[in-house]
């Protein structure tokens, strides 16, 4: 794995979690903001966030952020952050359809060596049991975090990180920049790279 600083990232899902994240990263690094909702993207390109989470000045400051609905653009990213919702159904069970759909889209457009970071709120084991097999199936690549260092060398694959979102919609005090970010990675190197990435936008630091 290249241990250098990530030069281009993507954020998948531009709701109340993904949009502030994409805008924050867009001030620091080349960022692709991906969503399938064309009306939402048109608003964002015009500097308008109907939810009020991001203001026009913040959009303008994110000079390196580009919005798109083209999944093929995800192949350009060295790290892809999945920030789609995981709503609860009437039986209070998590609806994983947005997450599995996003995993399929990411997997089909995943470049070797990339890191996929899940921000979506999920139950323990969900990432490894559900998301990673989808990524492997769709990409034809191997999850390298599940292999030892010797087997990892020279094998085309991808890595996985996790950083649970902690944003409270509408809260103007406790924002992305001011809340300590918890991060995890499937290898020590993945953890280091994910931590360094979030440190660029989270003033409160990472843990």
Question: Where does each model-flagged region fall?
Answer:
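Conserved N-terminal Rossmann-fold NAD(P) cofactor-binding segment
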Residues: 3-8, 30, 36-79, 85-93, ...
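Glycine-rich Rossmann-fold phosphate-binding loop(s) that bind the pyrophosphate
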Residues: 14
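N-terminal Rossmann-fold NAD(P) dinucleotide-binding loop
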Residues: 18-19
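Aromatic pocket-lining residues of Rossmann-like dinucleotide-binding sites
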Residues: 25
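Glycine-rich, N-terminal phosphate-binding loop of Rossmann-like dinucleotide-binding domains
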Residues: 82-85, 120, 186
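Rossmann-like NAD(P)(H) cofactor-binding subdomain of soluble oxidoreductases
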Residues: 88-166
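Internal alpha-helical scaffold of NAD(P)-dependent oxidoreductase catalytic cores
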Residues: 134-163, 167-207
């Amino acid at each position: 794995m290249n241990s250098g600083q990530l030069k281009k990232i993507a954020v998948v899902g531009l709701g109340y979690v993904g949009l502030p994240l994409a805008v924050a990263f867009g001030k620091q690094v080349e960022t692709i903001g991906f969503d399938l909702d064309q009306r939402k993207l048109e608003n964002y390109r015009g500097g308008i966030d109907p939810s009020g989470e991001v203001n026009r000045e913040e959009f303008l400051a994110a000079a390196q952020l580009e919005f798109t609905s083209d999944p093929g653009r995800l192949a350009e990213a060295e790290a892809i952050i999945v920030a789609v919702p995981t709503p609860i159904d009437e039986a209070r069970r998590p609806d994983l359809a947005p997450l599995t759909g996003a995993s399929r889209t990411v997997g089909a457009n995943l470049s070797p060596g990339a890191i996929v970071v899940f921000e979506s709120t999920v139950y323990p084991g969900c990432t490894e049991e559900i998301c990673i097999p989808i990524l492997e199936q769709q990409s034809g690549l191997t999850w390298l975090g599940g292999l030892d260092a010797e087997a990892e060398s020279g094998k085309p694959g991808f890595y996985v990180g996790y950083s649970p979102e902690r944003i409270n919609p509408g809260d103007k005090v406790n924002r992305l920049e001011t809340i300590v970010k918890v991060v995890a990675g499937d290898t020590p190197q993945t953890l280091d790279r994910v931590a360094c990435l979030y440190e660029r936008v989270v003033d409160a630091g990472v843990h």
